[in-house]
Structure formats: C-alpha cells, structure tokens
Regions:
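Acidic/polar low-complexity segments and flexible, solvent-exposed patches
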Residues: 2-132
Length: 132
C-alpha cells in the first residue's frame, strides 16, 4: 500500500465516522422537532397554502437562529434536517418562519428563495414516491 492510498483510506474513514456521528446526533433532535413542527403547522396554517421545506445540506450558522446555534455549536458542519415553514405570503415578501423557536420573519434574497423552492419540490416528490 503506497502513501497515497493510506492517506485516502484515512480520509474516507474519518469522513464516514463524522457522517455517522452527525447523523446520530442530528436525527435525535432535528427529526423529532421536524415532525412536531409539521403537526403544529397543520394546526396553525389550516386555511393557508403552507409548504414544509426540508433541507439536507451543511449547517449554516448565519442562516439559523440563536436557538439552533446553541444546540449545534459543538459541530459546525452538521448534516441533517432543518425544518422551515415557507408560506406563499412569506415567499412573496421574501421572508420565512423558523419553526423550532419563534424567530419571527427573516429576510431572504430572491436567489435563496429559488434554491429553497427547488429543494422543497425535490423533497416533496421524494416523499410522494415513498407514500405510494
């Protein structure tokens, strides 16, 4: 085994370990909160067109609220679910609602909204396939 292969193996091992750890930690908190958020959303926005947005991408401290930051501050690159409610009205005005704590409205650029919508549609299609 040459030097290059050894480094590659170590890199892969470390990457897998981190992913395994992150999945365990995130799933424990975020999954439970995500389903709770969905239940609350059903109650709160019965008469509105509400969309649940699920995102699987690296942890972004600048996007999240203080509550989320304290929860995940030990690991800056957590992969997991982050639940956000996007109503049609909030999309129109370029803001969104965070579910875990009542963070109020936060501004979003149009590009960010487009990206979120793309993820939302993709996730929704995946969920629909699972339901069938």
């Amino acid at each position: 085994m040459n030097k290059q292969n050894i480094f590659q193996t170590i890199k892969e091992w470390w990457h897998n370990l981190r992913r395994h750890w992150a999945r365990r930690v995130v799933t424990r908190y975020a999954k439970r909160e995500f389903y709770a958020a969905m239940r609350r959303a059903d109650e709160r926005y019965k008469h509105e067109h509400t969309m649940i947005y699920v995102c699987s991408k690296p942890f972004q401290p600048d996007v999240l609220t203080t509550y989320d930051r304290t929860r995940f501050k030990r690991e800056k690159q957590v992969w997991g679910w982050h639940a956000t409610l996007l109503t049609l009205q909030s999309l129109k005005f370029g803001c969104y609602y965070h579910t875990p704590d009542k963070a109020g409205n936060q501004r979003m650029k149009q590009k960010e909204i487009d990206v979120r919508l793309k993820y939302f549609i993709k996730e929704r299609l995946a969920l629909a396939k699972l339901a069938d």
